[in-house]
Amino acid sequence: MYYWFMPVSQTLHKARELGFEYVELSPTADFHFWHHYPKADDAYIAELNKAQKESGVKIATLNPVFNWSCVDEEERQAQVRNWRRLLEIADQLDVREIVSEFSGDPNTPRRCEHQWYKSIEELTPDFEKYGIQLHMEAHPYDFVELHDPAINLIRGVNKPWIGYEYCAPHTFHLSDGKGDVERMLRSAGDLLKEVHVADVFNHKAFD
């Protein structure tokens, strides 16, 4: 969550006013932004930690988006570097869960899959060093957009710290228009670690 017209630290106080105890922080330009190196410095992190303490609201998860499945190897390496800094920041904020996306390009799914697994291998020591859990979601326009292939990709990593996040707003993307929520949730099994809940529209209803 964010209120774009106030500093990120202030959103924690706003969350307290609204009755929340935990928040998930999505990309914003002054913290971590889509595909860019995180901009939070020590002072920024200290301000967020102060806000957590004063408000009583805990940053439960971060939701970074980095193109770590990019088929361009130089760009992929840059995105892995972005991830390393993000994980360092998460540790300083005492955030132990991160939700993210596969990214990549749906037009080159096989090559992107290779790159994603390569990035996971390179970042495994970092996730394990900080004791951070990673929950992946299949997202529209990523190299994997459907529920079942995403589950298979996550299972293939075969690490206890990586799981699946089901995003209800993307239900009809995940199911190719079927909307079979119960089947998807059950098929995720023990890999299901987090659920995002919101209204959803079937974009294929009139195809």
Q: PLM features: what roles do these ranges have?
A:
Residues M1, V23-L25, I59-P64, I98-S100, ...:
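Hydrophobic faces of well-ordered beta-strands that scaffold small-molecule active sites
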Residues M1-L12, R16, P38-I45, Q79:
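N-terminal-biased segments
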Residues W4-F5, H32-K39, E73-E74, F143, ...:
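Gly/Pro-rich active-site loop or hairpin
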Residues P7-T11, A43-L48, H147-I151, G179-R183:
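Alpha-helical scaffolding within the catalytic cores
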Residues V8-A29, I89-E97:
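Catalytic domains of carbohydrate-active enzymes, especially glycoside hydrolases
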Residues Q10, A51-S55, W68-Y166, H173:
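Active-site acidic/histidine proton-transfer and metal-coordination neighborhood
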Residues G19-Y22, G156-G163, S187-K193:
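Glycine-enriched alpha-helix->loop->beta-strand junction motifs that scaffold or abut catalytic
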Residues E24-Q52, C70, F102-T108:
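Glycine-rich, proline-tolerant flexible connector loops at the mouths of alpha/beta enzymes
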